[in-house]
C-alpha cells in the first residue's frame, strides 16, 4: 500500500520549490526499451536538458537500463545526467521497503526518521458507532484507511492532530476493537483528542504519528478501556510538552 496520499506527495514536492510535477501511470511506459524511454519520454515529451536520479535508478522494460546506460544515451543528446547520493539511515540506504517495514512493525520513530517528517494521514472524518461518546465518555475522530493505503502496525499511538488552526495532542488506536467488536469487525483508526469539542465530520485533518505505545487488547470492562484511552491521552500531552521544552 502507499505510504503517502497523492495530496501529501504533491505538497512535499511543491515545498521544494518545484513548479511542475507529473506522475504518469507506470503502465504507460513500462514496456519501452531504455533507448525508447530516453527518446520518447525525455526528449519528445519533456525536451529535457538535465536529468537527476539516484545511483540505483533503473529504467526501460525489465529494468534493462541503469545509470551508466542513461549517461551513454543522454550524452550525445546534450542531456546532463546528475547522480544523487542515496539517503542513509542506520548505515543503510533509505527505501520505501524499509519505511513500510518500520510502519508495519510499529517502529514509528524509525519510519519518521527515514521520511524526514512524521508519518501522517489526512483521510476524511467518518461517523463511527458512537461508542466512544455514549459508553466511554471519550468521543473519537474516525479516519479509516482506504484499501490502497499502507496500514501501520495495529496498536495505540501517541499522535497529534491539526484542528482549528493548531496542533492538539491525541491518542490514536488502529485495529479491531476486541472489547466492543466481533472478531471479524473491520479495522478502525480512532483518535481521542482531550479537551477538544468541535465538529470534525467531513473534514480531512492531518494526523501525525509520533510514538507506538502498546498493542490493542481486550479489556474486561468498558471502564478499563476508558482508563487506557485517558492514560494514553495524558501521556501524549506530556510527550509533546517535553518536545516543546527540548
Residue map of PLM features:
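An acidic, carboxylate-rich microenvironment
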Residues: 8, 36, 69, 98, ...
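Residue-level signal for inorganic ion chemistry
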Residues: 13, 51, 111, 159, ...
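Residues at the C-termini of beta-strands that transition into short coil/loop
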Residues: 25, 85-87, 211
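Glycine-rich, Lys/Arg-enriched anion-binding loops that position phosphate/diphosphate groups
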Residues: 74-175
Amino acid at each position: 500500500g502507499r505510504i503517502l496520499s497523492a495530496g501529501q506527495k504533491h505538497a512535499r514536492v511543491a515545498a521544494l520549490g518545484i513548479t511542475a510535477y507529473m506522475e504518469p501511470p507506470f503502465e504507460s511506459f513500462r514496456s519501452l526499451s531504455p533507448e525508447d524511454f530516453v527518446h520518447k519520454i525525455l526528449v519528445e515529451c519533456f525536451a529535457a536538458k538535465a536529468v537527476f536520479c539516484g545511483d540505483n535508478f533503473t529504467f526501460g522494460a525489465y529494468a534493462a537500463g541503469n545509470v551508466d546506460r542513461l549517461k551513454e544515451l543522454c550524452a550525445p543528446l546534450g542531456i546532463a545526467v546528475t547522480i544523487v547520493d542515496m539517503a542513509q539511515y542506520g548505515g543503510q540506504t533509505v527505501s520505501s521497503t524499509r519505511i513500510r517495514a518500520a510502519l508495519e512493525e510499529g517502529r514509528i520513530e524509525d519510519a519518521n526518521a527515514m521520511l524526514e517528517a512524521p508519518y501522517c494521514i489526512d483521510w476524511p472524518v467518518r461517523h463511527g458507532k458512537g461508542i466512544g461518546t455514549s459508553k466511554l465518555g471519550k468521543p473519537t475522530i474516525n479516519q479509516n484507511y482506504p484499501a490502497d493505503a499502507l496500514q501501520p502496525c495495529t496498536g495505540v499511538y501517541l499522535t497529534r492532530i491539526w484542528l482549528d488552526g493548531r496542533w492538539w495532542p491525541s491518542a490514536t488506536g488502529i485495529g479491531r476493537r476486541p472489547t466492543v467488536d466481533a472478531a471479524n469487525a473491520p479495522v478502525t483508526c480512532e483518535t481521542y483528542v482531550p479537551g477538544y469539542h468541535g465538529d470534525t465530520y467531513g473534514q480531512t485533518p492531518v494526523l501525525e504519528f509520533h510514538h507506538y505505545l502498546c498493542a490493542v487488547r481486550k479489556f474486561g470492562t468498558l471502564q478499563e478501556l476508558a482508563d487506557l484511552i485517558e492514560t494514553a491521552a495524558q501521556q501524549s500531552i506530556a510527550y509533546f510538552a517535553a518536545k516543546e521544552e527540548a
